[in-house]
From Swiss-Prot:
Quaternary structure and partners: Homodimer.
Catalytic site positions: 172, 179
Organism encoding this protein: Pseudescherichia vulneris
MF annotations from Gene Ontology: NADP binding; phosphogluconate dehydrogenase (decarboxylating) activity
Name the record gives this protein: 6-phosphogluconate dehydrogenase, decarboxylating
Keyword field: Gluconate utilization, NADP, Oxidoreductase, Pentose shunt
InterPro entries from the UniProt entry: 6-PGluconate_DH-like_C_sf, 6PGD_dom2, 6PGDH_C, 6PGDH_Gnd/GntZ, 6PGDH_NADP-bd, 6PGdom_BS, NAD(P)-bd_dom_sf, Pgluconate_DH
Enzyme Commission (EC) number: 1.1.1.44
The keyword Glycoprotein is assigned to this record: no
UniProt function note: Catalyzes the oxidative decarboxylation of 6-phosphogluconate to ribulose 5-phosphate and CO(2), with concomitant reduction of NADP to NADPH.
Pfam family, one: NAD_binding_2
Pathway: Carbohydrate degradation; pentose phosphate pathway; D-ribulose 5-phosphate from D-glucose 6-phosphate (oxidative stage): step 3/3
Amino acid sequence: AVMGRNLALNIESRGYTVSVFNRSREKTEEVVAENPGKKLVPYYTVQEFVESLETPRRILLMVQAGAGTDAAINSLKPYLDKGDIIIDGGNTFFHDTIRRNRELSAEGFNFIGTGVSGGEEGALKGPSIMPGGQKEAYELVAPILTKIAAVAEDGEPCVTYIGADGAGHYVKMVHNGIEYGDMQLIAEAYSLLKGGLNLSNEELAQTFTEWNKGELSSYLIDITKDIFTKKDEEGKYLVDVILDEAANKGTGKWTSQSSLDLGEPLSLITESVFARYISSLKEQRVAASKVLSGPQSQPAGDKAEFIEKVRRALYLGKIVSYAQGFSQLRAASEEYNWDLNYGEIAKIFRAGCIIRAQFLQKITDAYAETPAIANLLLAPYFKQIADDYQQALRDVVAYAVQNGIPVPTFGAAVAYYDSYRAAVLPANLIQAQRDYFGAHTYKRT
């Protein structure tokens, strides 16, 4: 409800009159009452709402993904005319979007599955927008979407046509998977600095403030520095009294499931999903901590040196995560015939969305230089960072393992990097085993 309300206010602020409808009459009245003088026109039946719009009608749905979206579409259909456009701005599973696009197209309606990132504030002030569907239908809503989107530092709006049917929602799904990876990498960096150097919350905030001035400059680093010093009403640091169970809404899981369907090694992001799952086993972890032993932890040595190693490890880990995510976008583009523009996708992530970061411009530059590049790690800039920072990543992972600090995503970054650069892997033995017990055959070198 908040996302829908804020998007309506955003659209209204760009000079449009917006018809609003909610199943709950009270919520519809509330939105209008809380925003006096705004060009928000309330309607209390679906028929009146639809009939209030100019044709071709442009209807933005912001409802809970799943059955709710189908119910909303079915309630609209009796009053729609051929050529009308429904935009689904929810966190919808892309296969559902492909199905709805096909079904509505057959009836003469247009359907645009649109990823919207930036949370409640982004919806109001300017989100990153990822529309997918019929190109001609997108052209009819592009003026509105362009006006409400976030604007990057170079003045470019953070919206672009992504591709046919489910492409927009797929890109939003991968965006969310990358977000999981970013957040887990940052959490592991925090754990290392706290466990290895015993940094105070003030020192952590100062460290992240410095990091936010350089390569790691991003929304997530920015909010993390603020989180470290936030206190509750009792004067305690809030982060220290929050239960260590991370919830999830399932979009990270969808990204990992899709990687398995496509045969893409999305190991870092998948580990970040599993890290949330194991965090939720709080009772088991507390019990296990009293039974299972670990190593005696040793201090991490020189403070400034270790902080810099963790910073480098975090940046290279982030690069590996994005390399995996964009590799999966390439595989999906081929599988679903979307013809994705990876440089443009990186561009619209530069503002408005949760993963917005300075380094996204480097991804755009890499694809501009070599559009068909197989993996971002092979681009000159990222290859140079890998050359310069891999030792720090290895040192940090080795320290963590020797001192019993779990670093699933840092570990996944090293494993993926070494596997990807290996001309020969021990998979020949696996294939021999498969042939031995199942006559699966093999290829000779």
